[in-house]
Amino acid sequence: MSVAAAGRGFASSLSSPQIRRIALKEAKLTPHIWAALHWNLGLRLVPSVRVGILVLLIFLPSTFCDIGSVYNSSYETVIPERLPGKGGKDPGGKVSYMLLMQGQKQLLHLEVKGHYPENNFPVYSYHNGILRQEMPLLSQDCHYEGYMEGVPGSFVSVNICSGLRGVLIKEETSYGIEPMLSSKNFEHVLYTMEHQPVVSCSVTPKDSPGDTSHPPRSRKPDDLLVLTDWWSHTKYVEMFVVVNHQRFQMWGSNINETVQAVMDIIALANSFTRGINTEVVLVGLEIWTEGDPIEVPVDLQTTLRNFNFWRQEKLVGRVRHDVAHLIVGHRPGENEGQAFLRGACSGEFAAAVEAFHHEDVLLFAALMAHELGHNLGIQHDHPTCTCGPKHFCLMGEKIGKDSGFSNCSSDHFLRFLHDHRGACLLDEPGRQSRMRRAANCGNGVVEDLEECDCGSDCDSHPCCSPTCTLKEGAQCSEGLCCYNCTFKKKGSLCRPAEDVCDLPEYCDGSTQECPANSYMQDGTQCDRIYYCLGGWCKNPDKQCSRIYGYPARSAPEECYISVNTKANRFGNCGHPTSANFRYETCSDEDVFCGKLVCTDVRYLPKVKPLHSLLQVPYGEDWCWSMDAYNITDVPDDGDVQSGTFCAPNKVCMEYICTGRGVLQYNCEPQEMCHGNGVCNNFKHCHCDAGFAPPDCSSPGNGGSVDSGPVGKPADRHLSLSFLAEESPDDKMEDEEVNLKVMVLVVPIFLVVLLCCLMLIAYLWSEVQEVVSPPSSSESSSSSSWSDSDSQ
């Protein structure tokens, strides 16, 4: 039973006249929300977790190695000694190391891990706003796995390039090993791993907990044979990964390091997916080196929606993939990630987002594998699911490093293969050595030495030739700062502010691309009492007007109390979970953080699948709420948005009214910007007009080091008119609008003119009648009276 179906039961307490169903349809996909990390749970490892669990610490980037941050109870310095092969020969993919652990010599036998990594994937990055293909220097054959000689149940998984970095399991104790960067003697740190954190997932599966495992459906013998055949063969998930700008900076703004780190993460995720006989293959990587082309707010629900739109528009036609995952670097508050259930192999919803705001690769890879499981149709486990001796099932609400797929996960995955025929997972990717892909002129992507790429529209393109070179005299071919094949003037406005919390960007006169989108730092005050988040002022009045149109506004407190204390799908502070089968009732302090309740509604919105509206009488008006829980439009438009004001110095975050410190606002504009500007999302000053960046202390035209140079007021006025006729398409649209206006206005003008002429004619006839000369008899009479008087 779906979440919406379960909600209908809870809504039955409302009287039917009060519930006016606008639309209600079943959908097939569901977004998943992840909760925050909990740092107080211990981890005790057992031998059976060898492959799937602890491999994930293998590739901790050495630049982020911080022994004080590792959950360890003790550590020692060791010097691994690589042993030569028998007879001095290279064993070919095999290597042995000797090291001293706790006073005892341990011999490690390792073998290169087969099949992974795939080395023929394209790597894209941006240079002056132009998408280009990179060829980073990558280490190959770095990932080795093996065992300790003479230690039953032992397991070793390490990266041997640039020292040993990874995990060793001995007698149910897990050890981490990392090289010491300052050592000249190949010294390493070996430490025991304890008290590892877990990720908690609080989202309800699409089916009720009692039905999650699903009784076996009656299948035809042929179906069973097909499923058995599918299960016995390795499945391949072709994954495209995107790294956002902040995470790229956390990897030292180094493309080589970022690529290697992503390859390592994918390799480690494979140690989980082996449990369902599936291999993740990296088919492409894009690094947002110059800023994020989409809005990436704290709320990952919005990020998932924005990323999926970007994926459909920019990626689908460029690189074939079964799923695409976005890795972001910021702390997302209560959420750790988002994924579409059953999204793999679908062109519309093959997306997920994960937050990697720490350096615990182990936990992050577990989260990635969990979300990938949802992409593959695997729902959350319930208490009756089993996953062997592991402490946590990977698809349970508690996701730990000691995790694995359960029997329920296998059943869900089998049904996904059956329902979707598993076509996209059964294609084995080609095994080729990694090489730079030759530029493919005409694919719409600027590659290698291409100056432009007009795709299939080269014949009519004014700037780019079919040979992917700029035409004679052209400086550029596309971009917000390119007009008529030339760069726009320095200081021209290229992206105006969309909200009071957004900031404008300007062209620098030397490139065709507009600078990355910038906005006021999350937590900046707006509209008197509200706060900015992701470039938008989280004002509930504005949210109501966006849904219902003007003059809708946020309802009074009585409406919020009446609606959000019902604990049904029209009013709640949280959806059901497998631990709690009911909707959450909003407490008094959280009542403004549940469903958005609006009043003064004059127009009903165009509803979407699975949307319903509720109206509750309030005085002479109505209070309106919306149940918009579905997968094609996340986040739920009916919920109060994260970051919305709920009490003095407090904001809503995951249905809870909490301190505004969760927005991580750390700007002091009076000090940093000398009171002449605000802080942007890059934590730089955006100066008011009349002051210059970087600190707004000297005269200038305003802006920031991120926004591009701001033109003088006269230039900005010209750039606005420049924007108004930026392209021939815009001109055509304007001409069409003008033509339509003329068609409407001219007849009206003619009618009015005709009426005026008729009125003038009528008035003129009346005037003529009044002033017309007297008749002859009247003249004679008048004349006789005159004679009489004279006598």
Curated annotation (Swiss-Prot):
Testis. The active site is at E371. InterPro entries: ADAM_Cys-rich, Disintegrin_CS, Disintegrin_dom, Disintegrin_dom_sf, EGF-like_dom, MetalloPept_cat_dom_sf, Peptidase_M12B, Reprolysin_adamalysin. The chain crosses the membrane at residues 741-761. Its EC number is 3.4.24.-. Its main location: membrane. One of its GO terms (cellular component) is membrane. Residues 438-522 form the Disintegrin domain. Residues 1-65 form the signal peptide. Residues 235-429 form the Peptidase M12B domain. GO terms for molecular function: metal ion binding; metalloendopeptidase activity; metallopeptidase activity. It is an enzyme of class 3 (hydrolase). Glycans are attached at N72, N256, N407, N484, N630. Residues 663-697 form the EGF-like domain. Disulfide bonds join C345-C424, C385-C408, C387-C393, C494-C514, C667-C679, C673-C685, C687-C696. The keyword Metal-binding applies. Residues 201-220, 772-791 are annotated as: Disordered. It is found in: Membrane. Residues 762-791 are cytoplasmic. One of its GO terms (biological process) is proteolysis. May be involved in sperm-egg fusion. This is Disintegrin and metalloproteinase domain-containing protein 1a. It comes from Mus musculus (Mouse). The gene is Adam1a.
